[in-house]
């Protein structure tokens, strides 16, 4: 028997017109579910109509349920006609008829209330969700000095509302579905209908529909199921906790996947360039943003290549150094028993462990652990003549460069590539250094994301100068950014009208 595709209970049956049958069925299916609340009532002038209400404790707004559903039904004036029930529950914010037990049980487990009516072969679903969740808080992972401070929560509807609040356009679509055969996690696709490329949208929808797994609990999991090329360390999707970033991305023709229970929203498609765009890039003047972006691209090269470059120079090609630098290197390494490669790996791995320890420790203690631990370990290693002072400086500069890159998933790929270059340089010196960088660049240039080159706009598939260069290393003034990037469908790339005064 295929235990994955076989349901524990057969939920495909239709709803019985006899309330007692529905009670027996629900009790059997939901056996040992002590958080299930079941209530039976007799209503009508002569109390001849049986009702059965089912919901999960802790997932519903009981006050709303009592005031809008139960109290009207218990009125003595309730008519004998069963079809008149909708007139007495119209105060409920949202309700509808459902026909199968599968829909009924799924609704109950999703935080809704289901009412079974004797003599009616269908049930009424009341929207009564009231999940325990935290409120909207500051974005702690993508801090911005200028601009909005709010961030997403674990509530799907709260997150879609934060986006809808910023884009008050009827063409902003929200397509809601479920994923996971057991978790039945709600998710929503959000896009602007006249900006999105329909072929990309269709591909994403087909990918999501094909995912057959028992549970999806975070967009980080969903990202891994969506990616086609799992042989690259570079992220092919973007995760963010900032509603303003999602709103601006949607207005560029991109698609957002909002997953219930996840405080991060998935953006796709992506290119290499979007990972260097900080949250407040568009709230600052273009000169400042351009300067910062150039620094970030330099930081990316340093974070990947500096340790390997030091291994290549100190271990294979010290003759390329000017004499004062060479003497300083020899003096710094005096008394160190290990070769250069062991020095660098020892310090890099130590800093990686300190970084992980800082992440795992709670609150401010984690940041303190990272800074103080790094200083203590580095100084102790130098005093013990296990490593040279130059190696500590190299590793520290590499760490600073890595932390300056805005996207955490992207920096994780850089951390792996750093060790790749260190190993190559340990065997072949500068030849390994340049070959390694060449291999990384070739890999990036060959990657694609839904038909869009990953290295766009450095790689342009249409053989013409891309409008994306206006938002690349140099960020043009906002008045000159008249076109949307290549994510947008053809014919909808104009973002703003020409200023007659500037002609």
Model features per residue range: what roles?
Residues 1-305, 323, 444-503:
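Membrane-embedded alpha-helical signal segments
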Residues 309-312, 322-325, 330-332, 336-503:
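Generic detector of multi-pass transmembrane helix bundles and their immediately adjacent loops
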Residues 122, 132, 141, 148, ...:
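Glycine-rich, flexible loop/turn motifs
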